[in-house]
Amino acid sequence: MNLSLAKNYFGRVFDLFKIKLPGQMGIDKDIKQAKFRNNQNKAMVNIMFTHAWMVDHIKSFVKSENITPQQYNILRILRGAGEPLSTLQLRERMLDKMSDTSRIVERMVSKGLVQKAVSEKDKRMVDVILTPQGAELLENLDRRNEELDAVVNHLSDEELETLNSLLDKLRNNH
């Protein structure tokens, strides 16, 4: 299949992922690697590179509030849940499953962003509760959400839906 047929067949996916046709910048130029083992390898490298790029943006975004991306994630999870959650429940919902949730929560307690209390549902468990200070920090970041949104603002709603569908499909295949 030639490139023009492929572009017609895959439609906006080429544009969505900024797939570069000959003569344009792409992952190969970004990391100065001329050849990849195959398209699957190139896609994996591109996803890893994009992940690192996104993490850098998020680190920069939360730095002003003196928190880490993992702490931001926990604050968002607690606010979204609307109720206290155990550290196990937090770990299950976190974006970074390898995080040491207990240690992160302890740091957040020392900053006054969350509190820990014995669970009312199960006295053997400890619940993590969002404090007013933690909620205020989230509100400060909410007012600046357009900084994060700017990363994908150049994509149309259709492209964002396609991107989300493809990323979901990638994860759900395994």
Tell me what each language-model feature is:
Residues 21-26, 36, 40, 139, ...:
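Inter-domain helical "communication" segments and dimerization helices
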